[in-house]
Every structure is written in structure tokens, then in C-alpha cells.
Design a protein with these regions (language model features):
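Glycine-anchored, exposed beta-strand/edge motif detector
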Residues: 2-170
Length: 170
């Protein structure tokens, strides 16, 4: 059984020269921790849509914020910015070292960049690895369990639904 304890929306490597930002949330927007975000035309954050907006800065929500019934800018959300190593949710298979773009089917999640399908100016970051380990349970009595730790975000292939570490580049 695969095991991971780090939630999406967690900064995994402290960057002393980078700081998080608190940006306003657009009206009628519900943001989950770990969603990839971008600014709308008014400068308020929205969950990055499946349409993949080109040439925009991307952020990752570090907290959940529900502005479903609020006005533009009524609430703010702390976000990771370009340069941060942060966790997000994969929406498909991704190999380590691969650039990632917004998923075409799930807003706020990422998939592998494919040159024939995506523009370079849609890249959000680079996938480096995922946390986890293996829990093994003995087949017979006394049913001992062991855990092999891989908590340092080892460079393993990601699958749909995995919480993965990306370095934001845009």
C-alpha cells in the first residue's frame, strides 16, 4: 500500500529569498489547499481553468478559502510563487523532471507537458518527485507491519491523484 503524509499545498523546501504572498480571491470562487491558481483580468485569484491560460503567473494555494458568496477581493489567500517547491495534485501519469501544465479535465491540478499538445507558455512548473513509502504486512501470524520510508520526495513516476512536488517556474 502506498503511503504519503504531506498534503497538497505544502512548501517542501524553504527558500530564504522567496516569500509567500497573500492575494485577493475572485467572487464566487472556492479554492482548495493545493489548487494551482492564476489571476483573472481584475487581478483576483481563480482556480486555473482546464482551458489552460497562456502567459500568466501561476500560484499554489497554501490554505483553503471559500469566497463563493463574497465579492472580488473580499478574502485573501496565502500562495506559493515562482521558485517555490510546493505540493500539488497530479491528474495523470507524470515522469520526474517533466514540465507540467494545468490539466485539461480537472481545474487546479496538473498533467505532464506534451510539446505537440501544449504551448511552452502554459508551463506551470517541473515535477521532481512524490512523497511516500511502502507499508508491508506479513501474510501470516503475527502479521507484522513494516514501513519503508521515501519521505524525501523520491523521483518516482506520479499517477492520477498523487500529491506531487513541483517547482513553480511561472
Amino acid at each position: 500500500m502506498a503511503f504519503g503524509t504531506t498534503a497538497a499545498g505544502t512548501i517542501t523546501k524553504e527558500q530564504t529569498l522567496l516569500s509567500i504572498r497573500r492575494l485577493p480571491v475572485a467572487a464566487s470562487t472556492n479554492i482548495a489547499k493545493g489548487n494551482v491558481l492564476e489571476q483573472d483580468a481584475g487581478g483576483d485569484l481563480i482556480v486555473s481553468p482546464v482551458g489552460r491560460t497562456a502567459e500568466v503567473n501561476h500560484y499554489v494555494a497554501l490554505e483553503a478559502v471559500d469566497n463563493s458568496s463574497g465579492a472580488d477581493g473580499a478574502l485573501h489567500v496565502p500562495v506559493a510563487v515562482a521558485g517555490h517547491f510546493v505540493t500539488v495534485v497530479a491528474d495523470g501519469a507524470i515522469r520526474p523532471g517533466t514540465a507540467v501544465v494545468i490539466s485539461g479535465s480537472t481545474a487546479g491540478q496538473v498533467i505532464a507537458y506534451v510539446a505537440s499538445s501544449h504551448a511552452k507558455n502554459q508551463v506551470v512548473g517541473i515535477y521532481w518527485g512524490k512523497e511516500g513509502g511502502i507499508v508491508a504486512k506479513a501474510a501470516g501470524s503475527p502479521y507484522l507491519e513494516s514501513f519503508t520510508d521515501a519521505a524525501d520526495f523520491s523521483p518516482a513516476d506520479a499517477a492520477d491523484g498523487d500529491v506531487i512536488e513541483v517547482q513553480l517556474v511561472d
